[in-house]
């Protein structure tokens, strides 16, 4: 019923490749019928103008958007890109964003994959619950300004220790070379000195290895 879902969703073929394959199969099948031959495959609709094609295009664009590090996409940008890739069926765009696998927020005019939206919502709820039950620590963070008798944390770097003492949930963010590793080492020293348990986790095996090497601690 839905060849695009079969190829893109089940076989994990990229949309552009799947689109090219399916449209070519449709063209060859139509030519076979015209020439009195058996079609290679019969589709239930005109694929080029079908809702299945438009929906697969929208899902592809949202997934590519996530691969670029974004979890939402402006509906105007999404529609413009959809029109470029599949102009023949872009008039079905509005119907497609009503699909059960897609979330559209009218207030922000943003579109996202439902699975991602639900994941982010769950994370947000966990963070909010954590912040509602803060347990503060009264530690002298200045004791941890010097790392390994060599490196001195800047005021900005040591700020994370203050936040950790005040809030249950903190985010240490920064581009490469900004000193996140030194701040992390200071955090570990502070936790150890005050008999606090901790675990080091990373999103990938490679990142875990780097974290372990930089802190001389086990990380997973």
Where are these regions (language model features)?
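Conserved ATP-binding/catalytic motifs of P-loop helicase motor domains
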Residues: 1-220
